[in-house]
């Protein structure tokens, strides 16, 4: 089988493009004729094991010299079957899975999932104020840690190693706070349906206040290193361009959408966890490029510091789990010295109170609570964009289906629009400005 120009092609090229006719022939002849073409385009694979692809992302690039003529993403190398696994676990056990999706934003994964479960249960208005405040506090700390990784790794890929060192230095302070509060640096499963696994430990508030002071002092350093560096600006300005029409067509959200000038933020448009009561701004840019997304992430960290301070001022003593004993675990299974849960005081209370309390606890932990049949969609504004959860219940103790709209997956579809027509070296900048995390993309 071969292709050739039709005799009538020349008359129709200007309006309908080139006309091809298909005639009989051998496939080997077609391949040989293509090889003899004067077109010197080649296809190269960037990844899936490449230091600049933010994980196991494979980019298939067709290049003509140094110009990218076609770009495609190859995903699925980090598929873990989290959505399928949720169908075989209780609603509470689901948090241990969802926290591992986008492993740089675990608290957003947990909150989005728990908000959906609470909506199905009809208890979204019964969550204690202290639990909601702590959720917001942890999410804003998480927003900063995610942006720090994005800025640090993006700078490293451009050769700005100082930004990388500063970014991971400041992120380490946030991970220390995570470890104090949840016992882990990542994969926390701290936010549960109905509230939290446990209250803040002693010293957590003071450590967070100390971090806020340090971060306010350190943030201007990023401005000096990046925005004051003409080489850094030249590498990012007008690179990875995607205007508002492109964002709307591709469903891009987060800093990508806000860099096109639209101040869309779910914390403002569809508030959750009491965000409507906090004072903060939604930064935007009109550059539609990688540099604008970088500036937005810097400003979002400043706004997160404002929200964290408001959270600390609002913290008042109170419960961190709903009062419904059919949902809340007795004593909330406080962490023990081993970090694995079941403190000795808790075990003593359950084992020594009554046989009925032990039976109730056993059934609640092993079988789980039942969720009324129905379906719902819940979304939060993660550092990458809109993180949505579509949860379906059939009335049992396990989810019938849970689907996640991960912003990294959606935003990554814009890669071709950003890169095609540009230079090979600019692909690195464009992908870094998208900030994809393959754990969330592949799930």
Curated annotation (Swiss-Prot):
The keyword Transport applies. SUPFAM superfamilies: HydB/Nqo4-like (SSF56762). Its main location: membrane. Its EC number is 7.1.1.-. One of its GO terms (molecular function) is quinone binding. It catalyses: a quinone + NADH + 5 H(+)(in) = a quinol + NAD(+) + 4 H(+)(out). One of its GO terms (cellular component) is plasma membrane. Keywords: Cell membrane, Membrane, NAD, Quinone, Translocase, Transport. It is found in: Cell membrane. It is an enzyme of class 7 (translocase). Disulfide bonds: none annotated. The keyword Hydrolase does not apply. Belongs to the complex I 49 kDa subunit family. NDH-1 shuttles electrons from NADH, via FMN and iron-sulfur (Fe-S) centers, to quinones in the respiratory chain. The immediate electron acceptor for the enzyme in this species is believed to be a menaquinone. Couples the redox reaction to proton translocation (for every two electrons transferred, four hydrogen ions are translocated across the cytoplasmic membrane), and thus conserves the redox energy in a proton gradient. This is NADH-quinone oxidoreductase subunit D 1.
């Amino acid at each position: 089988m071969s292709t050739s120009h039709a005799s009538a092609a020349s008359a129709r090229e200007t309006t309908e493009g080139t006309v091809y006719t298909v005639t009989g022939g051998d496939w080997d002849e077609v391949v040989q004729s293509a090889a003899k073409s004067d077109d010197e385009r080649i296809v190269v694979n960037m990844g899936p094991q490449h230091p600049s692809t933010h994980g196991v992302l494979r980019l298939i690039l067709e290049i003509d010299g140094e110009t990218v003529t076609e770009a495609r993403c190859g995903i699925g190398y980090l598929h873990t079957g989290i959505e399928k696994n949720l169908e075989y676990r209780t609603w509470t056990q689901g948090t241990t899975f969802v926290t591992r999706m986008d492993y740089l934003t675990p608290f957003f994964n947990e909150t989005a999932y728990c908000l959906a479960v609470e909506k199905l249960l009809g208890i979204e208005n019964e969550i204690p104020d202290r639990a909601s405040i702590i959720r917001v506090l942890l999410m804003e700390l998480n927003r900063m840690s995610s942006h720090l990784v994005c800025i640090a790794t993006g700078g490293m890929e451009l050769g700005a190693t100082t930004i990388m060192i500063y970014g991971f230095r400041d992120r380490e302070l946030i991970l220390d706070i995570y470890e104090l509060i949840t016992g882990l640096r990542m994969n926390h499963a701290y936010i549960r349906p109905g509230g939290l696994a446990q209250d803040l430990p002693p010293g957590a508030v003071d450590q967070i206040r100390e971090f806020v002071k340090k971060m306010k002092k350190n943030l201007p350093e990023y401005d000096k290193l990046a925005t004051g560096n003409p080489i850094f600006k030249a590498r990012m300005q007008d690179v990875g361009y995607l205007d508002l029409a492109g964002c709307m067509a591709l469903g891009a959200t987060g800093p990508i959408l806000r860099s096109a000038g639209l101040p869309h933020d779910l914390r403002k448009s569809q508030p959750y966890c009491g965000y409507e009561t906090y004072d903060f701004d939604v930064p935007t840019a009109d550059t539609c490029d990688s540099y604008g997304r970088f500036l937005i992430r810097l400003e979002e960290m400043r706004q997160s510091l404002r929200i964290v301070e408001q959270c600390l001022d609002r913290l008042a003593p109170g419960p961190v789990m709903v009062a419904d004993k059919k949902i809340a675990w007795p004593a909330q299974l406080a962490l023990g010295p081993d970090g694995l849960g079941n403190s000795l005081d808790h075990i003593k209370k359950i084992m020594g109170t009554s046989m009925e309390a032990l039976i109730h606890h056993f059934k609640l932990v092993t079988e789980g609570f039942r969720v009324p049949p129905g379906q719902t969609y819940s979304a939060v504004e993660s550092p990458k964009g809109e993180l949505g959860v579509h949860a379906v219940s059939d009335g049992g103790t396990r989810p019938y289906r849970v689907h996640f709209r991960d912003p990294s997956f959606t935003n990554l579809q814009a890669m071709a629009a950003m890169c095609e027509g540009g230079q090979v070296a600019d692909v690195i900048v464009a992908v870094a400005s998208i900030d994809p995390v393959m754990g969330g993309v592949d799930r």
